Amino acid sequence: MTATSPYLELGYVARAHGLRGEVAIRALDPASETLDTVDRIWVRTRAGVEREMRLEALRPTPKEDIVVLEGVESRNDAEALVGAKVFVFREDLEPPAEGEFFQGDLVGLDAVDANGNALGRVEEIWTTGEVPNLVIRASGREELVVPFADEFVPTVDLEARRIVIHPPEYVEAGRKGAESGGGPEDAE
């Protein structure tokens, strides 16, 4: 989904829960409380069927939210949703503050270095610590994982679909070693 999309990807339906049609929705960002703030979601099943669904009830748990969705009455109904991607409507969210971004808007941006050289495309965001990490991939290159912090990402231009990256020093050192072969014979 692009920055102009009416939806932002929140997570996915991880599993059916119980016998009465509840589902467990796991957010891509474990710290996200977004589902608490909306009344509806957009669901895309593995079969490609898309539809709006209303939230009737929500119970947060440490790993996921247990949700009752309108029209999902049985375990079979819930199991049919397992693996479905879950999106929220952009219009239902508070806009991000100046200099802040919805993580979903960063996925798909072209990543370049300070000189404009292509590094790849932001394919994923890992939220494993205090700072999210951008996963940048390009054909024929190693995956680049960069902390989403001003020091490493000085510019985000959603209109141009571009992000400027200052890779961490360890990435630059690894790249130089790979270019020269990186073996002890190259250390002279």
Curated annotation (Swiss-Prot):
It comes from the Bacteria. Binds ribosomal protein uS19. PANTHER family: RIBOSOME MATURATION FACTOR RIMM. Gene3D superfamilies: PRC-barrel domain, RimM. Residues 98-171 form the PRC barrel domain. Belongs to the RimM family. Transmembrane segments: none annotated. It is found in: Cytoplasm. It comes from Myxococcus xanthus (strain DK1622). The PRC barrel domain binds ribosomal protein uS19. The keyword NAD does not apply. InterPro entries: PRC_barrel-like_sf, PRC_RimM, RimM, RimM_N, RimM_N_sf, Transl_B-barrel_sf. GO terms for molecular function: ribosome binding. The keyword rRNA processing applies. SUPFAM superfamilies: PRC-barrel domain, Translation proteins. Keywords: Chaperone, Cytoplasm, Ribosome biogenesis, rRNA processing. GO terms for cellular component: cytoplasm; ribosome. An accessory protein needed during the final step in the assembly of 30S ribosomal subunit, possibly for assembly of the head region. Essential for efficient processing of 16S rRNA. May be needed both before and after RbfA during the maturation of 16S rRNA. It has affinity for free ribosomal 30S subunits but not for 70S ribosomes. HAMAP family: Ribosome_mat_RimM. NCBIfam families: 16S_RimM (TIGR02273). One of its GO terms (biological process) is rRNA processing. This is Ribosome maturation factor RimM.
